[in-house]
């Protein structure tokens, strides 16, 4: 019986091709992954919704549950992604204004963003999973994390003190069915 003598690189490539993860898509030239919708809520069970063109986190009940915003995701690297809402037409961005850094919503089509363009880096977030929860760090502003306030119906923002007890940086992040 003759043993196949192929390079390990080919075997590894074949295995990666056969057993890839949808949430860890990797671009090969043009981005092969399509936009996916996710539900997001913080560890205090506050969901995201839009109020006066601002993304806020609060407790939605009864008929208000339909106001929940799904997060549109386009993976750009194994743990980096563009985040948007409204079918990917409004994108979350790390906005620098002087010494201030804040979360913004910009009217940009998420599928038009390009991870190799420096000006699009502000829309990229790095996903870190820790058990059942996920945190999102800005790629453009390292050390700044997506956060919610402890109080309900407050704007979703960014913080550079993720261990601070007045900000929530841990989220449940689940693909929408």
From Swiss-Prot:
Q: Which residue ranges does UniProt annotate as crossing the membrane?
A: none
Looking at the keywords, is Membrane present?
Answer: no
- Provide one Gene Ontology cellular component: extracellular space
- Can you supply a Gene Ontology BP term from the record? negative regulation of interleukin-1-mediated signaling pathway
Lineage, top-rank taxon, reads: Eukaryota
Sorted alphabetically, which keywords does the UniProt record give? Disulfide bond, Glycoprotein, Secreted, Signal
Leader sequence range is 1-25
Q: Which residues are glycosylated?
A: 109, 114
Q: Which PROSITE patterns does the UniProt record give? A: INTERLEUKIN_1 (PS00253)
Q: Which InterPro entries match?
A: IL-1_CS (IPR020877), IL-1_fam (IPR000975), IL-1RA/IL-36 (IPR003297), IL1/FGF (IPR008996)
The disulfide bonds in this chain are: 91-141
UniProt-listed Pfam families: IL1
Q: What does this protein do?
A: Anti-inflammatory antagonist of interleukin-1 family of proinflammatory cytokines such as interleukin-1beta/IL1B and interleukin-1alpha/IL1A. Protects from immune dysregulation and uncontrolled systemic inflammation triggered by IL1 for a range of innate stimulatory agents such as pathogens.
Protein family per UniProt: Belongs to the IL-1 family.
Q: What is this protein called?
A: Interleukin-1 receptor antagonist protein
Please report the organism this UniProt entry assigns to the protein.
Tursiops truncatus (Atlantic bottle-nosed dolphin)
**Gene name, Swiss-Prot/TrEMBL:** IL1RN
């Amino acid at each position: 019986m003759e043993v196949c003598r192929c390079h390990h690189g080919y075997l590894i490539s074949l295995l990666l091709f056969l057993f890839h993860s949808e949430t860890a898509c990797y671009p090969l030239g043009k981005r092969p992954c399509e936009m996916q919708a996710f539900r997001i809520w913080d560890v205090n069970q506050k969901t995201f919704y839009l109020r006066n063109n601002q993304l806020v986190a609060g407790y939605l009940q009864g008929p208000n549950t339909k106001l929940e915003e799904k997060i549109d995701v386009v993976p750009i690297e194994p743990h980096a992604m563009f985040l948007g809402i409204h079918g990917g037409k409004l994108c979350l961005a790390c906005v620098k204004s002087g010494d201030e850094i804040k979360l913004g919503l910009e009217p940009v089509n998420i599928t038009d963003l390009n991870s190799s363009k420096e000006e699009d880096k502000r829309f990229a977030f790095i996903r870190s999973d820790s058990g059942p929860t996920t945190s999102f760090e800005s790629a453009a502003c390292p050390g700044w994390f997506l956060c919610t306030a402890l109080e309900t119906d407050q704007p979703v923002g960014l913080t550079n003190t993720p261990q601070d007890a007045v900000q929530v940086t841990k989220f449940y992040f689940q693909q929408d069915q």
